[in-house]
Amino acid sequence: IPPSRSSDCRCVPITLIVGFCIHPTGLSSVAKMIDEHPNLCQSDDECMKKGSGNFCARYPNNYIDYGWCFGSDSEALKGFL
């Protein structure tokens, strides 16, 4: 079940454990925000480009299309996984 009543809702993480849901009509502004956020990622390469780490750890929630950047040897990554 999605985190909101709407199956069209997409989760947008703000921090490691906090986020909000948005309807797809607002996704272009959210995509821009995620591009600008230093720790949100879709790939390891994106983390390296942002300088936020070298590993993109995906959220375990299928409704979140992004991950969080970590250094591959960081203690925070071990806690996230």
From Swiss-Prot:
Task: Cite the post-translational modification comment.
Answer: Three disulfide bonds are probably present.
What Pfam families does UniProt report for this protein, alphabetically? Albumin_I (PF08027), Albumin_I_a (PF16720)
* A GO molecular function held by the record: nutrient reservoir activity
Q: Keyword Disulfide bond: yes or no?
A: yes
Q: Which InterPro entries match?
A: Albumin_I, Albumin_I_a
Q: Is Disulfide bond given among the entry's keywords?
A: yes
Q: Which residues form the propeptide?
A: 27-34
**Keywords associated with the record:** Disulfide bond, Knottin, Seed storage protein, Storage protein, Toxin
Role according to the record:
A1b binds to basic 7S globulin (BG) and stimulates its phosphorylation activity.
Print the domain comment field: The presence of a 'disulfide through disulfide knot' structurally defines this protein as a knottin.
Q: What is this protein called?
A: Albumin-1
Q: Which organism is it from?
A: Lupinus angustifolius (Narrow-leaved blue lupine)
